[in-house]
Amino acid sequence: MAGESTNSVGNDITSLIQPGLDQVIQDEGVQVTLINSILGWCRIHIINPVKSSKIVKSRAFQITMIVLGIILLIAGLALTFVLQGQLGNNAFLFLIPAVIGLVKLLATSVFMEKPCTPEKWRLCKRLLQQLKIF
């Protein structure tokens, strides 16, 4: 019985907060602040520890990652055009690694070095909308 009353209170609070959240999340300033918070957490807990590891700092690892990325990009593009007749509409699936790589490059070059600004966020949103991701 007590669990049901707690649930109804939680539902009441959620229904009370939801309209305000929908309105606030549309504000670009709030979006940028949220993105900066998430990127800051990722930078501190994921990126910095990985960057400081010995294997990632090694020249061999860096060269291997660059070569692997180039091979995946070229292979994805080549397979898209070569196998398009056989695969039909599914040929675009070979572009997924290329798109992921481009989004990664965009995110790291635009956001990771400095905080996100509203202008950068508008640019990223526009690019993601053109890719039909966001």
UniProtKB/Swiss-Prot annotation:
UniProt main location, coarse: membrane
Pfam families (alphabetical): CRPA
GO cellular component: outer membrane
Membrane topology: Multi-pass membrane protein
Keyword entries, A-Z: Membrane, Transmembrane, Transmembrane helix
Transmembrane segments: 63-83, 92-112
Localization annotation: Membrane
Keyword Transferase: no
Record InterPro entries: CRPA
Keyword Membrane among record annotations: yes
Designated name of the protein: Sulfur-rich protein
